[in-house]
Amino acid sequence: MKHPVDTSQWGEFLLNDIATLTNGNKFDKNKMSHDKPSINFVSRTGFNNGISDFVDKIDGTEPYPAGAITLALGGSVGSTFVQPKPFYTGQKVGVIEFDNKSEKMKQFVAVVLNKVCSTQFSAFKNEINKHFKRDLSIPLPLKSSADLSNYDSTDIDWDYMETVMS
């Protein structure tokens, strides 16, 4: 490992306080057309970056942008990926969008989120979809100047995440 991860100065953040969260398109893959496929279709699978098909662009429906993070809310619960290309989603796929964050920063968040989800949530018991937009929190590194007893999202150390993932 190039950069050992120091977790001594981390804080807990509600995901909906630091990113824009949506429940995806909720499209039915079996009803998608495949005449001129040009858009990735992300479902609840934990394989292939969550991409389970390649479908036609839908008139009037813009795909989510490349760089958005997808989170399986069912199926392979908690599978988290940064999407490399524009995409649509199936049912029970959350989409997380950050403003002005690098690919590496988003990859860091995706790894942390995947770990949190794999330890705290499961299908049919404590389902993540009940928490996704309401109270899902993740630990993130804080700047060295942050007060551990009183911090906010401006104290998140995004540069540290970039360094660790480089």
Q: Could you say what each language-model-derived stretch is?
A:
Residues 17-138:
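DNA target-recognition domains and sequence-specific DNA-contacting regions of bacterial/archaeal
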Residues 135-147:
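An amphipathic, hydrophobic-aromatic interaction surface with interspersed Lys/Arg
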Residues 1-26, 33-49, 145-166:
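Non-catalytic DNA-recognition/assembly elements of restriction-modification systems
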